[in-house]
């Protein structure tokens, strides 16, 4: 059986390999759900939805990887070391893109849940194991960034907000229509928020769903004070 056939067989049977990952994710999601339910409920009566668009995560396979070997052995792979010495692999299920580095580090982007992020990283680990025949160890998985958006359904007086919160804000409407709000109440909770006059916002920098909802609730409480 060649590498392509092995890869296809793995992908067809991946659900069996994801049992551990699914249980782990379920436990994590339950804990996150318990912590953030109160915040979510507060948003419901305001008719506000917070939408996650992208989760960027990372993991380590604890081996050095022959990127060229992997690139010529599987489909949906790109490797151009003259531009960047990184292998790019695209998966359809879950739909995501992985950057694989020679030192075994994986960066995954394009998923919207932690469950899919773990599944995507583990699929990449399996593919690397099949192709290289090396002993792959999947470890150090973590979420690096969550990108989300929401519509607060209120017009915002950005000029006044920028003046009152100038230590946190950067607002240059002649260059960019949005106000950049650097939220950092603690060293463990920080985010960059783009705020538009329409009330739409984009939140980046959070590393958990619970922190994302905390940031949104805090910034919403600020924004309602500047309703136009």
From Swiss-Prot:
This is TATA-box-binding protein. Its main location: nucleus. Belongs to the TBP family. It holds the Pfam family TBP. Coiled coil: none annotated. One of its GO terms (cellular component) is nucleus. Sequence repeats lie at residues 52-128, 143-223. It comes from the Eukaryota. One of its GO terms (biological process) is DNA-templated transcription initiation. GO terms for molecular function: DNA binding. PROSITE patterns: TFIID. It is found in: Nucleus. Belongs to the TFIID complex together with the TBP-associated factors (TAFs). Binds DNA as monomer. The gene is TBP. Gene3D superfamilies: TATA-Binding Protein (3.30.310.10). SUPFAM superfamilies: TATA-box binding protein-like. General transcription factor that functions at the core of the DNA-binding multiprotein factor TFIID. Binding of TFIID to the TATA box is the initial transcriptional step of the pre-initiation complex (PIC), playing a role in the activation of eukaryotic genes transcribed by RNA polymerase II. InterPro entries: TBP, TBP_CS, TBP_dom_sf.
């Amino acid at each position: 059986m060649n590498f392509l056939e092995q890869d296809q067989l793995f992908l067809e049977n991946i659900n069996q390999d994801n049992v551990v990952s699914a249980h782990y994710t379920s436990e994590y999601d339950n804990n996150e759900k318990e912590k953030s339910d109160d915040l979510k409920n507060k948003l419901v009566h305001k008719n506000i939805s917070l939408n996650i668009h992208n989760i960027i995560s990372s993991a380590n396979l604890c081996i050095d990887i022959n990127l060229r070997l992997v690139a010529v052995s599987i489909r949906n792979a790109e490797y151009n070391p003259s531009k960047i010495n990184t292998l790019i692999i695209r998966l359809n299920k879950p739909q995501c893109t992985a950057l694989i580095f020679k030192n075994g580090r994986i960066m995954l982007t394009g998923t919207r849940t932690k469950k899919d992020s773990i599944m995507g990283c583990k699929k990449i680990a399996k593919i690397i194991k099949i192709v290289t025949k090396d002993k792959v160890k999947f470890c150090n998985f973590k979420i690096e960034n969550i990108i989300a958006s929401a519509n607060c359904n209120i017009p915002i007086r950005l000029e006044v907000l920028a003046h009152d919160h100038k230590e946190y804000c950067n607002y240059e409407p002649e260059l960019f229509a949005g106000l950049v709000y650097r939220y950092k109440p603690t060293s463990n909770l920080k985010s960059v928020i783009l705020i538009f006059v329409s009330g739409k916002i984009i939140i980046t920098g959070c590393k958990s769903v619970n922190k994302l909802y905390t940031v949104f609730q805090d910034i919403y409480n600020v924004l309602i004070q500047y309703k136009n």
